[in-house]
């Protein structure tokens, strides 16, 4: 039985070409579906979850975190690579407290800023929006901050709502980068 080489080789080449082509699928985002903090707090009692902070550049580390946020209080616990508690950020109403859990003492924002340099740019509402996954978190970023770093986001659609899944802060023309990646986020319904 004689096999036509062209018929045999063409499907293989077509398969190889299709396998090597990039699969860059761009999806148009419907911003009207972005989560809204007021609406989320009306529907849910709390947001909780976990994630990791990844630093690349001059400082390289991975810190896992757990968070919980309700209407008037929130907290984030950062852990080192061995999952030991490292820092606590506690928010009650508009007050933010930073606590070094290894040394068992409160610290000021500048000390925490050495770990996470965006801290001085975040107020209580920004932390809260971050934990609830609200995409407009940095819409009102001021001009001086824009010169210091850039922010990029990746959204995920959950229950027909766009939520923040990843935030990347790039400093000094991408020499230093801090990525906040949310591994899971749960919402507890109001009863």
What annotation goes with each model-predicted range?
Residues 1-20:
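Sec-dependent bacterial lipoprotein signal peptides
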Residues 73-125:
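An acidic-aromatic
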Residues 20-37:
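Bacterial Sec signal peptide processing site at the extreme N-terminus
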Residues 59-63, 68-72, 88-90, 95-97, ...:
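Beta-strand-dominated lipid-handling architectures at cellular/organellar boundaries
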Residues 56-60, 79-86, 174-175:
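Solvent-exposed loop/turn segments connecting transmembrane beta-strands
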């Amino acid at each position: 039985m004689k096999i036509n080489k062209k018929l045999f080789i063409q499907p293989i080449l077509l398969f190889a070409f299709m396998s090597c082509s990039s699969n860059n699928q761009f999806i148009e985002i419907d911003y009207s579906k972005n989560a809204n903090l007021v609406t989320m707090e009306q529907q849910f009692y709390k947001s909780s979850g976990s994630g990791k902070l990844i630093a690349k550049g001059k400082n390289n580390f991975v810190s896992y975190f757990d968070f919980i946020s309700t209407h008037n209080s929130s907290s984030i616990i950062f852990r080192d690579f061995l999952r030991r508690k490292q820092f606590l950020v506690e928010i009650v109403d508009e007050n933010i407290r930073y606590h070094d859990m290894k040394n068992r003492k409160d610290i000021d924002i500048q000390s925490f800023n050495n770990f996470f340099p965006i801290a001085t740019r975040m107020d209580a509402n920004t932390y809260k929006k971050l934990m609830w996954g609200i995409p407009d978190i940095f819409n009102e970023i001021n001009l001086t901050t824009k010169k210091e770093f850039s922010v990029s986001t990746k959204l995920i659609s959950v229950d027909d709502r766009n939520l923040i899944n990843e935030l990347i802060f790039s400093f000094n023309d991408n020499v230093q980068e801090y990525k906040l990646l949310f591994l899971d986020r749960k919402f507890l319904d109001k009863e």
